């Protein structure tokens, strides 16, 4: 992918770009839902980040990231015009210096008249809905609300709860389902960044 960006200021920026990908059916199944394909999209993005000055543990107070693309996919099954939109929102609610409520929402939608499995959005794991194996889930529609109650033990250490909820649709398998992840975690600020240990 390639992007051309314009910086409004320290917090806001926009991009226009182009991205493409291809996938091969290495098992040569070539069913109605698994096939070699190539896609290409013209994309646009908006990004807003509000930083909390002096907070090295949670430097990003608010994040808004919007991305959309219009393009097409070519496969052995058929050719399709497609559109996608991706939205990620994050915000920290500071109850006081030691108690923080963290909200994060990830959302994805791919519009197409037909789908192949290997083009679907992959999710699950520590960077999306926790309690599931990394990228073990797939769908053309995915929406989630990821929450943490964070208690700061010191300037470089905190513990937190995990309550994650998600919904997805996989039209290749005619699946519509809800997901729930529960757990807890521990975060430690190191010289190399934030080390996070999670059980969910």
What are these regions (language model features)?
Residues 1-53, 123-126, 136-139, 194-196, ...:
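Gram-negative/organellar outer-membrane beta-barrel architecture
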Residues 50-52, 57-60, 71:
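Long, internal scaffold/assembly segments composed of regular secondary structure
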Residues 34-38, 56-58, 77-81:
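Short, contiguous, pocket-lining structural segments
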Residues 42, 62-200:
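C-terminal transmembrane beta-barrel domains of outer membrane proteins
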């Amino acid at each position: 992918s390639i992007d051309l960006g314009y910086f409004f200021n320290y917090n806001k920026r926009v991009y226009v770009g182009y991205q493409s990908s291809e996938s091969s059916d290495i098992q040569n199944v070539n069913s109605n839902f698994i096939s070699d394909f190539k896609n290409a999209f013209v994309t646009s993005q908006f990004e807003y980040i509000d930083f909390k000055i002096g907070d090295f543990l949670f430097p990003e107070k608010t994040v808004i990231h919007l991305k959309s693309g219009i393009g097409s996919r070519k496969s052995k099954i058929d050719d399709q015009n497609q559109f996608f939109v991706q939205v990620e929102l994050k915000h920290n609610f500071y109850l006081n210096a030691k108690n923080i409520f963290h909200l994060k929402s990830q959302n994805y939608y791919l519009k197409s008249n037909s789908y192949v499995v290997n083009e679907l959005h992959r999710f699950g794991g520590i960077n999306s809905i926790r309690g599931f194996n990394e990228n073990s889930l797939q769908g053309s529609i995915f929406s989630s609300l990821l929450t943490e109650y964070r208690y700061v033990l010191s300037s470089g250490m905190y513990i937190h709860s995990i309550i994650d909820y998600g919904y997805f649709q996989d039209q290749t398998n005619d699946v519509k389902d809800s997901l729930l992840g529960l757990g807890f975690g521990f975060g430690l600020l190191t010289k190399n960044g934030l080390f996070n240990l999670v059980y969910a």
